[in-house]
């Protein structure tokens, strides 16, 4: 049984952010990493798997960042996921969140239902990183659904060659009421 400790999760997220912010294009983790005890991250992930012609063009990276921010804000803050998909969605939508199904129709239904149930939902993107066809956001979620302190989230989006969203992963957690270091979580 694989155990994901907070340290391992934070270390992995830090490695992803470091790779993306340095423009390396590759986040590497092998099963022999971490002492070869089988508790490391398995496999090799290369961002170029989905984009054989990865170009680190500042213009394209800016476009991708802008598209993801607009996609998220249009869907959740403007409560218009249909428009978000029309403007920023690609030909397919692969979803890795276990609460949502694949496909843009499922995304529209999920967001419409969620924002109808919690109309005060607001997403504030605090940081955004882009590398090739991936964009990572670090966000604060507020509103009734998230309690008094809110929720933090890291979302990873993959975009197609036209800068349209085609895949999504996320990690979400409640903001802690106490902190050993006094630093904000988002």
PLM feature spans:
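Bacterial N-terminal signal peptides that target proteins for export
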Residues: 3-13
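Bacterial N-terminal signal peptides
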Residues: 13-23
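Intrinsically disordered, low-complexity segments
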Residues: 19, 29-30, 137
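Short, low-complexity N-terminal intrinsically disordered segments enriched in polar/charged residues
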Residues: 24-74, 78-87
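A beta-strand edge to alpha-helix "cap/lid" segment located at domain peripheries
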Residues: 34-56, 73, 109-186
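Soluble or luminal CAZymes and related metallo-dependent hydrolases
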Residues: 63-67, 106, 149
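A solvent-exposed, acidic/Ser-Thr-rich amphipathic alpha-helical stretch
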Residues: 81-131
């Amino acid at each position: 049984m694989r155990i994901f400790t907070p340290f391992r999760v934070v270390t992995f997220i830090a490695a992803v952010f470091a790779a993306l912010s340095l423009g390396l294009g590759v986040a590497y983790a092998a099963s022999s990493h971490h002492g070869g005890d089988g508790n490391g991250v398995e496999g090799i992930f290369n961002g170029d798997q989905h984009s054989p012609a990865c170009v680190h063009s500042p213009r394209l990276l800016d476009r991708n960042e802008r598209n993801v921010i607009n996609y998220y804000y249009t869907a959740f803050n403007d409560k218009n996921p249909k428009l978000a998909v029309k403007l920023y969605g690609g030909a397919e939508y692969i979803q890795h969140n276990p609460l949502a199904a694949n496909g843009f129709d499922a995304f529209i239904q999920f967001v419409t239902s969620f924002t109808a149930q919690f109309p005060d939902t607001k997403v504030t993107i605090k940081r955004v990183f882009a590398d090739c066809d991936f964009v990572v956001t670090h966000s604060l979620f507020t509103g009734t659904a998230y309690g008094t302190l809110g929720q933090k989230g890291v979302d990873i989006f993959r975009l197609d060659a036209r800068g349209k969203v085609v895949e999504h992963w996320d990690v979400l957690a409640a903001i802690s009421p106490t902190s050993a270091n006094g630093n904000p979580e988002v």
